[in-house]
Amino acid sequence: MEIISSKRFILLTLATSSFLTSNTLCSDELMMPHFHSKEGYGKYYQLRGIPKGVKERSVTFQELKDWGAKKDIKMSPAPANKVPHSAANLPLRFGRNIEDRRSPRARANMEAGTMSHFPSLPQRFGRTTARRITKTLAGLPQKSLHSLASSELLYAMTRQHQEIQSPGQEQPRKRVFTETDDAERKQEKIGNLQPVLQGAMKL
């Protein structure tokens, strides 16, 4: 019994001593860079410090007061009715009036510019024009042009082109989109039938 208890006692003392020494060594290692940095900072401060010929002087309260008064920014109130030049190109919600700023020539140029941007839009936003319709339909055989689907396709596409050219007449938006989607589906069907028809004409 005495042998077991002495072994336990020895193990306990070894464990505690190793634990305590590791803690003290770790804390010493953590503190060492701190001391070194303070010493290095002191040396650096002495090297980079104030030159010998220059003396430090204290700032008086009056100088601080004068310095603070110079730093105040004087703001003048802006005139209420004047619109700054930088606001000339802002949208209407920022106070620019389209009737005052734009001439009829500028308005016509703007409309022409928006019409020229239509070819980059997808088909359901009005990309197809009458020229494109005639080009696509000219490539189809004559028999398929007389069919009901191609005539409906031609009608839907020309009607869509007329709606783009005359935006003053308001059409129900949902109806225009459904007609355009139907026209796209019919055009895809005709495009799928075109190789078959060409093969039949060769025979």
Swiss-Prot record:
Q: Provide the free-text tissue specificity comment from this protein's UniProt record.
A: Isoform 1 is expressed at high levels in the hypothalamus and eye. Isoform 2 is specifically expressed in a region between the dorsomedial hypothalamic and ventromedial hypothalamic nuclei.
Q: Does the keyword Kinase apply?
A: no
Name its cellular compartments. Answer: Secreted
Origin species: Rattus norvegicus
Instruction: Specify residue ranges for compositional bias: Basic and acidic residues.
Output: 171-186
> Keyword Transmembrane on this protein?
no
**What protein name applies here?**
Pro-FMRFamide-related neuropeptide VF
Task: Show the segment(s) annotated as Disordered.
Answer: 161-186
Instruction: State a single Gene Ontology molecular function.
Output: signaling receptor binding
The family note in this entry says: Belongs to the FARP (FMRFamide related peptide) family.
Can you give the propeptide residue ranges? 27-57, 97-106, 128-203
- Which GO terms of the cellular component aspect does the record hold? extracellular space
For this UniProt record, the keywords arranged alphabetically read as follows: Amidation, Cleavage on pair of basic residues, Neuropeptide, Secreted, Signal
Q: Residue span of the signal peptide, if any?
A: 1-26
Q: Give all Phenylalanine amide modified positions.
A: 94, 125
Question: Per the UniProt entry, what is one GO biological process?
Answer: neuropeptide signaling pathway
Disulphide bonds in the chain: none
